[in-house]
Every structure is written in structure tokens, then in C-alpha cells.
Amino acid sequence: MIQEESRVKVADNSGAKEVGIIRNLGGSVKKTSNIGDIVVCSIKKALPTGLVKEGQVVRAVVVRTKYGIKRKDGTHIKFDDNAVVILKEDGTPRATRVFGPVARELRDKGYLKIVSLAPEVL
């Protein structure tokens, strides 16, 4: 679970390395975001030649959390870090590659392009 003011890694090649969470979308009193949720972020660290620049405000989808999730079959899945993938205005990923594993729940939430770009789906 990721809350506001958290700093998380970026798991794509958009040029951003770290973002700060500004707002969790999906409700007026929503405190935390889990895998597959949309967040509003500010770019905190970025490469100078990347698609995004430091200080830019973007939307992103959460692809990994340390907190983990419980599946209906009773299994738990946790990752080593918190990570997001930056999105365009139409909801597709801005980058052309996704680094690291992503959760299978992204497929259920309609992020098929991110799942197809990822090297591993858990």
C-alpha cells in the first residue's frame, strides 16, 4: 500500500527514476493505493535526456508494492520495492519497456499493454 507523500521507483524507460505520490485517485477519502490503482505523481529524479522532466506532474499506475496482495486462492505475493509505470493521458504507458516483474492483477484491471511489456508476470 502506497500513501500520499511516498517516494517510489519508476519501472519503465520514460527517463524518470523516482516519483513522489501527490494523490491517490479513486475516492475522496482514499488513503492508500494498491497494485493496479492510478496515482498522481511529481517527478523527483529523472535523466536529462528522458521523455519526462523533473517537476512534471504525471499519472501512473502502481505495478509493485512491498505490502503485497492476497489472492482468492489464498496465496500472498510481495515485491522487494514499490514501483509505478508512467501513463499517457489516454491510459497507455508512456515508455516502451517495463523493468522487473509485475502482478497478474494488472491484466484483470485492463492494463494489457503493461503486462505484455513486462519481462515477468507473477
From Swiss-Prot:
State the GO CC annotations.
cytosolic large ribosomal subunit
Which InterPro entries does the entry mention?
Ribosomal_uL14, Ribosomal_uL14_bac-type, Ribosomal_uL14_CS, Ribosomal_uL14_sf
UniProt keyword terms in alphabetical order: Ribonucleoprotein, Ribosomal protein, RNA-binding, rRNA-binding
Which molecular function GO terms apply here?
A: large ribosomal subunit rRNA binding; structural constituent of ribosome
Family annotation (Gene3D superfamilies): Ribosomal protein L14
Taxonomy, superkingdom: Bacteria
Give GO terms for biological process.
translation
Q: What does this protein do?
A: Binds to 23S rRNA. Forms part of two intersubunit bridges in the 70S ribosome.
Describe the family membership recorded for this protein in Swiss-Prot or TrEMBL. Belongs to the universal ribosomal protein uL14 family.
Quaternary structure annotation from Swiss-Prot or TrEMBL: Part of the 50S ribosomal subunit. Forms a cluster with proteins L3 and L19. In the 70S ribosome, L14 and L19 interact and together make contacts with the 16S rRNA in bridges B5 and B8.
Protein name (Swiss-Prot/TrEMBL) = Large ribosomal subunit protein uL14
